[in-house]
Curated annotation (Swiss-Prot):
NCBIfam families (alphabetical): PRK15409.1
Gene (UniProt): ghrB
Class of this enzyme: oxidoreductase
Name of protein: Glyoxylate/hydroxypyruvate reductase B
Family: Belongs to the D-isomer specific 2-hydroxyacid dehydrogenase family. GhrB subfamily.
Catalytic activity: glycolate + NADP(+) = glyoxylate + NADPH + H(+); (R)-glycerate + NAD(+) = 3-hydroxypyruvate + NADH + H(+); (R)-glycerate + NADP(+) = 3-hydroxypyruvate + NADPH + H(+)
Xref: InterPro entries: D-isomer_2-hydroxyacid_DH, D-isomer_2_OHA_DH_cat_dom, D-isomer_DH_CS, D-isomer_DH_NAD-bd, Glyo/OHPyrv_Rdtase_B, NAD(P)-bd_dom_sf
Pfam families registered for this protein in UniProt: 2-Hacid_dh, 2-Hacid_dh_C
Keywords: Cytoplasm, NAD, NADP, Oxidoreductase
Amino acid sequence: MKPSVILYKTLPDDLLQRLEEHFSVTQVKNLRPETVSQHAEAFAQAEGLLGSSEKVDAALLEKMPKLRATSTVSVGYDNFDVEALNARRVLLMHTPTVLTETVADTVMALVLSTARRVVEVAERVKAGEWTKSIGPDWFGTDVHHKTLGIVGMGRIGMALAQRAHFGFGMPILYNARRQHPQAEERFNARYCDLDTLLQEADFVCLILPLSEETHHLFGQAQFAKMKSSAIFINAGRGPVVDEQALIAALQNGEIHAAGLDVFEHEPLAKDSPLLSLPNVVALPHIGSATHETRYNMAACAVDNLIDALNGNVEKNCVNPQVK
């Protein structure tokens, strides 16, 4: 008999077929309590769980006593209670490699669109405001040869540094838990403490996962240390930034502008002050959102679940020690 799994995300037909070749699949819309109650027997029998964006906590795990592995269609896993998974010896698989280049493209797009005011001036053109030769009130700021500060030199940070160094001639500063010799050799990147990076960088790009250590890592004190001409980019996780402090820094002119793909609370509230600021480019968490990459992420997640339930945790496993 095939192992039973719960699928809480729509998959392309070929990937669903692949999943069904290995497992008995129950598809549900979400992991809300009412859904779990409606499919109580399927959840009780499931050995695997696959999807994205939903909260997986101790209360859900109580309903899934046979669960052995869960596979998320994402690199981030802050919506999972990892301690609860570890306590029950449930493997957590993720997709850390397939989205690197696409997310780096998005970060670079935020750098360019924020510096050159692309969204703002495009809207002015659509509104019929381009009636004569443009003046300084339409101008942006250069990107090439400006100093880029990267906070978090992981895979995405490295891909961003490659684009910035070779494509735009940007000097690279970076801050991370440890030095990255490859970044220093390939991109002439300079490791420095966070305060130095904030004081010297023209663009501060935050590419960090959310953890107890990084929650509200950026607040009033950090924005106060940045240049008034600096542009802040967040493409990691929203709660790494104290959003109220960011709003105040933008409103008070402590920093020049911000390009944001993530927010403390998502979706972003319609009445958020960020949406009324002309010096903010706000995206709906589209870092990896291309047809190609989202397909590859889903395919990776399917393969990860197959591997995990067959005892193979050599790659893409957050907690291999519980095997």
